[in-house]
Amino acid sequence: MTINSIYPATWLQLFAYDPQSQPPNYTGSERLTPEMKTYYDMTLLDEAQPNLVHDQFGQKRPIPQGSGKTIEFRKFAALVKALTPLTEGVTPDGGELTVTAITATVSQFGYFIVQTDVLELTAIDNTIVEATKLLGRQAGLTLDTITRNVIQASTNVSYAPKVSGGTETEVTHRYDLDESAQLTVDLVQQMVTKLRAANAPTINGDYVAIIHPYVAYDLMRDPEWQNAHQYTTSENIYAGEIGKLYGCRFVQSTEALILKGDPLTAAAENLTVKTEASSGTTLAVKEAISAEEAAALAGRKIYVGSKQYTIASASSGSANAATLTLEETIAETITANTVVYPGEGGKNNLAVFSTLFLAKDAYGVTEIEGGGLQTIVKQKGSAGTADPLDQRSSVGWKAIKTAKILIPDYLLRVESCSSRYSKTAKAN
């Protein structure tokens, strides 16, 4: 059964159920009352919405009805300056509004839980309610990740500089980021300046940054930091908002992107160079690599010595018999016993955190209301011969979702490490 309507939480009092109003042969397993439909749907949305941190700043569009799988976002071009003086009594030529349509294809996502307990329809069953809450959180995190992964593809990326003895060293690649390369107040000011220079519109008067708690830990210790309660009321605070710096409001989320390479084999996160290499494209390693692991290594990035390489292929073998073939020629002396790290993170595979800086209408998302996110409840007895003893019920969610970058200059990201947490954080 699909549930679409959203009603205020105060309607929960309508769950009082009068068995006298039901048909004489009503058993409690034939249908859901409208009030219970409402409750389950509200519960799902209430649990999903706090997790949609990346969605809340996008240009929202309803799910297209009857128009296939394509949704349209709109980008409006700025008007040129009107510098020509008006002539008395003469009507000047007018201009036109330039609108660019940007389309995206929607996809459907969903999940369900099978319940073996009896679904009691004369009262709200706690098991179903708890399942709906868990599903709501899962739906929110799923849809938030879909949006996050789209907008994290922005190519407007800056890397935090490394700092040693008070001297900054520019970083131009993710794999060079170390624990000293942190998000600083100066970097925040640089991002705000870039957005202002692009004439990017603010969101309710400020720009917004989505930041991981581990990165916020470093930034919040700055004396210029303002906690959220110091500049806004609880009614106007964003979901996850923690504070503000130089015209940028920071929203904290554990789903802010963390970049770190997976272990290179099932038994070892890192590999070890067996034989010194200073040319060619082959590295012999000490660890055993299975045929399945060798196939999975093709295309992976690694960090060895002081450079990043891409694995073209790997030859399986027992300990001291496996090799890696690289796409690039080895351009330095790599001595025996040098550690080979996964190369998708920072230096030596430190976790790298991506902080997004956003202006208004930087990207578009589909709404979860109006059919974007639905609760599906199947009571026991609804499966026919597939459930001959009426032993199972289910509750799940289904969503139609897409996201799209609309104006790349309005979306910036900074990749940095955390002084305390980059060694232990995991990719998400």
Where are these regions (language model features)?
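Structured, hydrophobic secondary-structure cores that serve as assembly/anchoring elements
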Residues: 67, 107-123, 127, 192-221
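A generic local secondary-structure boundary/capping motif
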Residues: 61-62, 195-200, 238-240, 384
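N-terminal "assembly arms/tails" that initiate or stabilize quaternary assembly
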Residues: 2-105, 411
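Beta-strand elements of well-folded, non-transmembrane domains
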Residues: 77, 117, 399-403
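Hydrophobic alpha-helical segments involved in membrane association or supramolecular assembly
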Residues: 73, 133, 137, 209, ...
